[in-house]
Structures are given as C-alpha cells and as structure tokens.
Amino acid sequence: VLSQTDSHQHAEGKWAQASARIYIEPQMDETFQGAYAEAIKNWNQTGAFTFEVVADPSQADIVASEMNDGSTAVAGQAESQTNLLTKQFISVTVRLNHYYLSNPNYGYSYERIVHTAEHELGHAIGLDHTNETSVMQPAGSYCGIQPRDVKAVQELYTSSD
C-alpha cells in the first residue's frame, strides 16, 4: 500500500477565477480518460469550481495525463507553474500513475482511481493536503469530494489575496 497518493510540494497558487480549461490527452488509457471525466463532472457539480474541457491543448490551463513510473511511490502527480508575484497558476499538469493504479496487486478499484483523479484536480484548483476526512488526504484515495473540500475551494476563491 502506498503511504501517500502523491508527492505534492505545496506551492501556493490558484487561478484568477474559480474556473480553468482542461485538456484530457486523447491517446491516454480509456480507464484514466473516464476517471478524469468523472472527476471533472464531480468537481463541477459542487458549484465551487468549474473545469471546462477543451479539445485543443494550446487552449488549456490544465493538462490531464498519465505516467508509468515505479521509481516514485505515488499514484498521481500534480505539477504546477506559478507566477510568484501574483501567486496565480500559469499551468498545471496532472498525471495518474499506471504503475500502481493499473496493477491488480495494488487493488485500486475504479472508484479509487476516480478519487485519485479528484485529488490531483484538487491540487490543480489550489488545494493542499489535509489530514481531515477529505479527497485531499495524502493517502489512500478512499474519500471522494467532501463538503469540507467544497468549502475549502469556496474560501480559496473568495479570499482577496
């Protein structure tokens, strides 16, 4: 069992508004494409943040991708470029890791893959890890998006800084 879902380094960041354009790589594994689509739908249903799926990567703020890396002990990854002056994201790439998520020995159900996608998209929104019951727990991917996660996004995007 992985000790944590990802190795997110906390870089303060958020978008100028509570929405971003996301490109889902079409050559990606269908299971991962489906998991991202479901995670996007679930975040959009909260009303706190809107992901707009775009067909052209050059139009995207966020790229949803995949990796297959056993040298890292993470099921997913979010890499962000942030403008250090404005503290706003320039771009974010999220990745789901086949090495763990697609390996039956690690026992990831489809639901947990969706939760991992929700977690990485949470980082792409600007959320950090929390030890509360939350989709942003560092480990496990047993939780989907919780009311506290919606509240955290609302607070992030209503704060003036």
Language-model segments: residues:
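Zinc-dependent metalloendopeptidases
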Residues: 1-161
